[in-house]
Amino acid sequence: MRALDYRAAIETITSFLSEKLEESGSGGFVIGISGGIDSATAAYLAAKAVGTENVLGLIMPYYENNDVEDAKLVCESLGIDYEVINIKPIVESFVSQLGFQPDKRSLGNIMSRTRMILLYAHANQLNRLVLGTSNRSEFLTGYFTKWGDGASDYAPLINLYKTEVWEIAKLLGVPGRIIQKKPTAGLWEGQTDEDELGISYRLLDEILWRLVDLKMPKEKIVEELGISVEKVEYVEGLVRRSEHKRRLPVGPEF
């Protein structure tokens, strides 16, 4: 992986957030707190940038599990205000009007977009900006919901790979329990990122860095990492198929 100066990265991100908030004339940030490392790290960076009093966390569970307690731990350890909103009745009300029963993936996307609506409702009401929590690993592979968790005003982690977020979280003092837990999008019970992606984040990041940033030939990646070409092509496919998720809608030019 690249040799990133994590302390310098923290300063770059916090300066960016402070400047953008001032430019916008907004009163602070609203962040969805899931109980995972990405939202925790984004919240810690935001609080460092603009003060804890200017950061609101929204905890928006669908299932009753330990994620809510982890999310509360993040907010309380950091000292930011937070609200808990159970999205299950909202999602169920929406689904009841569809005329069909959505499959697991569609339901997960509905959950994610419901959270986005709640984040922006609070941000609009409070004259604040929504901070996204997606990292570069998710962004490049399309592992996010379009117009759901991929929607935000600013995304402080968007140029950090997942393995780099872990290192920055340690420096910021994110609780160890959060750093050590298995990454999950929380879209259904028992779901984990790495199971759904079909690859560990550590290997994924090594491949992505070489494939996307260095534009290294596949054969060289195989040689350096000691993996099969099929594994590299699998990641390459994730990047290619998710291109539409990384840009605004486009049409033909005339």
Curated annotation (Swiss-Prot):
Pfam families: NAD_synthase
GO cellular component, one term: cytoplasm
Pathway: Cofactor biosynthesis; NAD(+) biosynthesis; NAD(+) from deamido-NAD(+) (ammonia route): step 1/1
Binding locations of ATP: 32-39, 133, 162, 184
Keyword Cell division: no
Entries under CDD domains matching the protein: NAD_synthase
One Gene Ontology molecular-function label: glutaminase activity
Domain of life: Archaea
Segments traversing the membrane: none
NCBIfam families registered for this protein in UniProt: nadE, PRK13980.1
Annotated function: Catalyzes the ATP-dependent amidation of deamido-NAD to form NAD. Uses ammonia as a nitrogen source.
Family of the protein in this entry: Belongs to the NAD synthetase family.
Name used for this protein in its record: NH(3)-dependent NAD(+) synthetase
Species this protein is from: Thermococcus kodakarensis (strain ATCC BAA-918 / JCM 12380 / KOD1)
